[in-house]
Amino acid sequence: MKKKQNRVAVSVFMIIGLVLLRGSASAGDQPVLMMATTTSTDDTGLLDYLEPHFKKATGIELRWTATGTGKALALGRNCDVDLLLVHDPEAEIQFVQAGHGVNRHPIMYNDFILIGPPADPAGIKGQSAAGGLAAIAGRRALFVSRGDQSGTHLKELQLWRAATPNQPEKEAWYVQTGQGMLSTIHVAAERSGYTLTDRGTYIKYENTQGGKPPLVVLVEGDERLRNQYSTIEVSTTRCKKVNADAARKFSAWMAGPQARKLIGDFKLLGKQLFIPNAEVR
């Protein structure tokens, strides 16, 4: 039976949960793959959708914990998982270069978007990402950040650096939730603020609101907003007990024709959440 962990900070409780899952995995007859992934692949329902197809194709049971990319990479460094599915290319490359992971493969992408109230009090609609954030800062309009070192949060900080020399973390109008993307969107909606989200999670949120969300897309299409997801196998040199075979099979399956079609067909409200772009291996 597939198990996924609650989206919480890396803590004693998360590590204990992963140890227990790994122990139960070794107790059964079928192979189990332990994966750490970003919240967006979980919040959107993508992994629930893919998991039974992967198990049928390979006989491997997929179990995952969903957290921010920074914390997912930490789980990989600590040898608590076999594989990562994450979306911060710069941090991923550093992870591999440091010897913690091997075989980083792009799998799919979508984009980041700036969303906010339809009235758009900061006047950001149609601007570039940097221009939109500069306008938010200039108007001191409420901005809600994940503040959790996730891939989305790190992208947001990168965009702020391009937008203004004065970083917003200590400003009263800048709120950090320390939570996942869906929860952060809900906080922004409750307070009529702006936030940065990946498009897939926004479509999921839009779906939960019956197609009429209180926050709308205001900034999109900037080339800086591309959001690439990749798999990384945890290094067996650093982590002797990882299930390297299962990790390789999942990575290869995600790049193959079946998963590419499934990812491309995965839609809510008739909208595609992720675009497959893996090179078939």
Residue positions per predicted region:
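Bacterial N-terminal signal peptides
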Residues: 11-22
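Acidic, polar ligand-binding/catalytic clefts
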Residues: 83-109
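Serine endopeptidase catalytic core focused on the charge-relay Asp
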Residues: 114
